[in-house]
């Protein structure tokens, strides 16, 4: 199976959600090596922890926006443009690791799952903007 992940945090964050994202990738690669795992990130960033993982597991790769258009609009790519790239690259399951999925993924044949880390926004909505 080809499994894609929102890899923004895995690539760009060195603590918190970045650690969580790398941990999920590490565990899945270790216990389910028959699958291919692709972490999709809007931008490249030097990250030694991520480099160790991709060096350790041949089935784990990084992917970035495929066209110059989406490279320039990388934030929009994460919420809209990524879906067509996932389809072209044969992703069967997409995991949003940090509370969100692409807005149009439901229109594709790709199954999806999202991890919600915190529900405090439900208890105290006045402290959060609607975009969040």
Give each language-model segment a name.
Residues 1-132:
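Carbohydrate transferase catalytic cores enriched for Leloir-type hexosyltransferases
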